């Protein structure tokens, strides 16, 4: 058995993992283009971002997978925007640290069903010269 595992490990080192992407391999342009397009994709969303009033509880896991719009548009004046949404349930464990109790429950999250590139609203475009309201004037990596 040990010889078999060693042979498999050596084969992976030589040929790469079975996913087809060898370490250091160049991804073809069309695959890069297709994968970067504005579309729904699975993203991990923190529960407290969707339910900010639930800070007195802990959740396991602390984030849930949902489909959300993401990707690049062909023009900087456009942004990838959800054009369809639905509500989906995710089972999570709610922990009440004060009572020492926990229970599994279903929480609802918005999931995107369709996306398209749409013009940015005037407040979304920032040329970088003037900070948006609430942003610091400068960002220093050492602060």
Swiss-Prot record:
InterPro entries: Cystine-knot_cytokine (IPR029034), PD_growth_factor_CS (IPR023581), PDGF/VEGF_dom (IPR000072), PDGF/VEGF_growth_factor (IPR050507). Expressed by the venom gland. GO terms for cellular component: extracellular space; membrane. It is found in: Secreted. Residues 117-143 are annotated as: Disordered. SUPFAM superfamilies: Cystine-knot cytokines. GO terms for molecular function: chemoattractant activity; growth factor activity; toxin activity; vascular endothelial growth factor receptor binding. Disulfide bonds join 38-80, 69-115, 73-117. Keywords: Disulfide bond, Growth factor, Pyrrolidone carboxylic acid, Secreted, Signal, Toxin. GO terms for biological process: induction of positive chemotaxis; positive regulation of angiogenesis; positive regulation of endothelial cell proliferation; positive regulation of mast cell chemotaxis; response to hypoxia; sprouting angiogenesis; vascular endothelial growth factor receptor signaling pathway; vascular endothelial growth factor signaling pathway. CDD domains: PDGF. Residues 1-24 form the signal peptide. Belongs to the PDGF/VEGF growth factor family. Snake venom VEGF subfamily. Snake venom VEGFs may contribute to venom dispersion and prey subjugation by inducing vascular permeability and hypotension. This protein activates the vascular endothelial growth factor receptor-1 (VEGFR-1/FLT1), and consequently promotes the proliferation and tissue factor production of endothelial cells, the neovascularization in the chicken chorioallantoic membrane, and increases vascular permeability. Also stimulates tissue-factor production and human monocyte chemotaxis. Homodimer; disulfide-linked. Interacts with VEGF receptor-1 (FLT1) with a high affinity, whereas it binds to VEGF receptor-2 (KDR) with a low affinity. Does not bind to VEGFR-3/FLT4 and neuropilin-1 (NRP1). This is Snake venom vascular endothelial growth factor toxin. It comes from Protobothrops mucrosquamatus (Taiwan habu).
